[in-house]
Amino acid sequence: MFELNNFDAIQIGLASPEQIREWSRGEVKKPETINYRTLKPEKDGLFCERIFGPMKDWECHCGKYKRVRYKGIVCDRCGVEVTKAKVRRERMGHIELAAPVSHIWYFKGIPSRMGLLMDMSPRALEKVLYFASYIVIDPKETPLLKKQLLNEKEYREAIDKYGEDSFVAGMGAEAIQDLLGQIDLIAGSKELKEDLKQSTGQKRVRIIRRLEVVESFAKSGNNPKWMIINVIPVIPPDLRPMVQLDGGRFATSDLNDLYRRVINRNNRLKKLLDLGAPDIIVRNEKRMLQEAVDALIDNGRRGRPVTGPGNRPLKSLSDMLKGKQGRFRQNLLGKRVDYSGRSVIVVGPELKMYQCGLPKEMALELFKPFVMKKLVQDGIAHNIKSAKRMVERVLPQVWDVLEEVITDHPVLLNRAPTLHRLGIQAFQPVLVEGRAIKLHPLACTAYNADFDGDQMAVHVPLSVEAQAEARFLMLAAGNILKPSDGKPVCVPTQDMVLGSYYLTMDRTGAKGEGMTFSNKDEAVMAYESKYIDIHAQINVRVYKEIDGVLKSGIIKTTVGKLIFNESIPQDLGFVNREDEKEKFNLEIDFLVTKKSLGKVIDQSYMLHGPTKTSIMLDNIKALGYHYSSIGAVTVAASDMIVPPVKYDLLHEADETIDKIEKMYKRGFISEDERYERVIEKWTKTTEEVADALMDSLDKFNPIYMMADSGARGSKSQIKQLAGMRGLMASPSGKILELPIRASFREGLDVLEYFISTHGARKGNADTALKTADSGYLTRRLVDVCQDVIVREEDCGTDNGIYVSEIKEGSEVIEELRERLIGRYTAEDVVDPNSGEIIVARNEYMNPIIADKVVSAGIKKVKIRSAFTCNCKIGVCAKCYGMNMATAKKIDIGEAVGIIAAQSIGEPGTQLTMRTFHTGGVAGSDITQGLPRVEELFEARKPKGLAIVSEIHGNVRIEETKKKRAVFVMGADGDERSYDIPFGSRLKVSDGDYIEAGDEITEGSVNPHDIMNIKGVDGARRYLLSEVQKVYRLQGVDINDKHLEVVVKQMTRKVKILESGDTELLPGIMIDIFDFQEANDKVREFGGEEAKGEQSLLGITKAALATDSFLSAASFQETTRVLTEAAIKGKVDPLIGLKENVIIGKLIPAGTGMMKYKGLNLNTKNEKIEENETEIVE
């Protein structure tokens, strides 16, 4: 059975005139649209009902046939078929042109495809097409050359000289069409291949480009003549609608205006040709027709754009596809959906982790069809119509039915911007009064939501399958870990942290200290009866079952800790239960801060899984809120105590600065050095004041409690409140050497206040710019990785990459342990001391094994990696390793490319924007933060380039008055010299031994240089560690595997150098697996293999170089991508996610993969016979 949307690939090509006539339902002959009196379409016009179908369902133009019973009849009076009005969205028309015109995409694009094919410059081509010059089509016996251009005067002279019929020349698209028809593609291709062998330089480049176009036409079966249009298709009228406004005026789509100009000029040209008008008039009309068609296809590509009222350029067919408002991004990749609503969110602390509060009226509207069905089922309403009436009148019975319907029917909540997959989660709805959605406080972090007026959208999964997926994969209680680094995302914040902190504090000398109680309950009762303080150190006998025997012991603790531990599993490994002394101790016997809560949740998840953890989280939430209310922590001005030491420290700093000034005035130190020392001194003084402040604050000081617990605020903010504000940056980003000495408690004077406004404004400006930049980076990352899916279990490769800790100078940025957890080994890991195998090859490393490896003193390990995965598309489960979001091995069908892009893009907004200026010292002004990440992913030449050694060898530095030079002496006597520019800082010293690819001066390295020196692996390692450095310095953890996925996509292409006996053309980019395949084929027959080099593409280039033209066209440069794809007759294999979303199929990830296609749901609660069940892979 043929299903329309069950196809495997989609192909694009040039349309022949016959094809266009076949699509069409009739010719549009008149420029009229709608009759303004009758409001009915004009016959043969742009909205003609005979061509495009009826305006109203089952009704012809003249009104002879009305009603559905005449379905399919063509009216004998007006010729309109009686059918649904929806056909006006799919029926096309056409315009027969009186003279052929060229298609602007193929003539004007860069490079001009028409120009390359005919071997003419685009400028010459333009002269011919727009009737400025004649072109010689056939010189016959005359000495004229084929394709020679003649202006009017030369043409007349040639005719006088050689006679009327002695040669053929023409102008306009007709002449070009004749010439295109004469091209022999196969012979041309052979000839070009011969020329290629002899040519070099610029000429070779041109031949390669021409060869590419010629081969495209030859292989795709497109006829070059089809680049010239004889028939123009007219798109269906409902895609270019005309609507009546209130005042009786009409609003129309720009396309109608553009079509109207084409029809008018075409009809005028026909008339002129019939009259036999003079050549010059006809020629002018033909040129105008050509311009009208250009404007219709791509307005503004050549010359001035055609404008509508108010000088606004009209939107042409190309503009309909381009950009954010174009067809691809606006209607195909994201659509508005039914069964959705949005409202303001408020906090719902009483909810369970998997619940959300849904306003009653919203729920009724969202679940309307379900409620109606249930009303009929339960016999409350007799038919659907009366059920609908009941719902619309909101009768009391409806609410009970609604309650039943929404039990076990999860809804999806989404908050924009959705930066990572945790921005959409599923919840079990609970009906609430009011009109606000209630959100669980622990879900806020994932959504980055707060309750200052944020809004969220609700979506209802309709089908049983969708509900099942929402419940099992998207329920908020299951999404406890972050997919980017595997750390918990549901960590309690603010009040909850403060309450837990308050609960687990100790206070010496509190009421009831030293008392002893026979069990927990007695101690809690004593607290509730106000005999003891919640923070008092007491002794309590606790009972525990050990090996089936009930034993007891006395422990020293506080009531607060007893209460807190009731909701915590007592086996998380914070206490060594083997030790006799610690057998009965409480699991959480320390002061709880936000950090330690994170560790508790992490441990609980690893040991007990998501369900138990989410129950524990709800308990911590309840305790936290309750005890933060009881603790009643407030802030007053009296809590900010300025440390008395501050003034001594400031005095001492002033004296030091005076000394530095004196040294500078006497010429002992330079201006830069003076500046650096002053800054250093003030930084140190500020730190000292802050330390003195923190030491002087009482442990029960509310401000100290908030900061120490991690509930709100930080040391640097307290420093500003009661210490000193310290150094500020000027608008240029340079640090001012005058610090702000006052704190907010003391108050700033006018100058200090003014200086601090610079920073405030810069902060705001940066945030606004950063959001847009970060969003665009995410979009490019998604586009480059979207087709990376886990496709198989094991690709069987023997390769891997060596990993060791990443360092920035002497500081370790990422530890080896972190890089090993959740990965597979690529070779046996052997203990260097005992020689025993710690981990065998292809083994999975969990945290315990990773600790073993590190403690054995091993510094580098070879692991399986996405870099070396052998999958032709996507990656395999073993090369990828652990799924960070579940801490288990990854499943087949997981869309790891999208997850990688989101994990890198989501923290983008936390990165800094600005370059830090440490006072204009050269070499240290390197880009950081977001611009640096972008620079790396786009593989650009960085600012502040470092000089890199090309060979291994020893360093010799020579300084003369004029310059410094560094010589590297290789072992084989090879010597390279590098001139060091003034102001650069050296990273090497005399006599050092350096490797190829090591930096000689400070700065960033051009990744392409590393590619040339160290090869693909070196470049990949460099990119990975450099991006990691930027994120880690900002305190953002991202797992390596996400970066590996992206960097692999950047290095997938091979540039062909020599084609050998393959069909590959030199100079083109091709996927590395296709390259290997082509070479394998040639090798079988003993031919010469193609030679190529792996290239490094930036993410934008890599996204555009994908095999899928749909994905590339919907990303950027739509017209260019489609032009190229059409000429090549490209086939889109629909492998990635984007292509499938565009054509409206299920994405090939998760349950949308091919192997699940045949599964049918058993929804009828039938028992499946044991022997019938098939085990589904």
UniProtKB/Swiss-Prot annotation:
EC number annotated for this UniProt entry: 2.7.7.6
GO biological process assignments: DNA-templated transcription
Organism the protein comes from: Clostridium botulinum (strain Eklund 17B / Type B)
Summary of the function given for this chain in its UniProt record: DNA-dependent RNA polymerase catalyzes the transcription of DNA into RNA using the four ribonucleoside triphosphates as substrates.
Protein name: DNA-directed RNA polymerase subunit beta'
Pfam families linked: RNA_pol_Rpb1_1, RNA_pol_Rpb1_2, RNA_pol_Rpb1_3, RNA_pol_Rpb1_4, RNA_pol_Rpb1_5
The UniProt record lists the keyword DNA damage: no
Gene (UniProt): rpoC
InterPro entries hit by this protein: DNA-dir_RpoC_beta_prime (IPR045867), DNA-dir_RpoC_beta_prime_bact (IPR012754), RNA_pol_asu (IPR000722), RNA_pol_N (IPR006592), RNA_pol_Rpb1_1 (IPR007080), RNA_pol_Rpb1_3 (IPR007066), RNA_pol_Rpb1_3_sf (IPR042102), RNA_pol_Rpb1_4 (IPR007083)
Cofactor binding description: Binds 1 Mg(2+) ion per subunit. Binds 2 Zn(2+) ions per subunit.
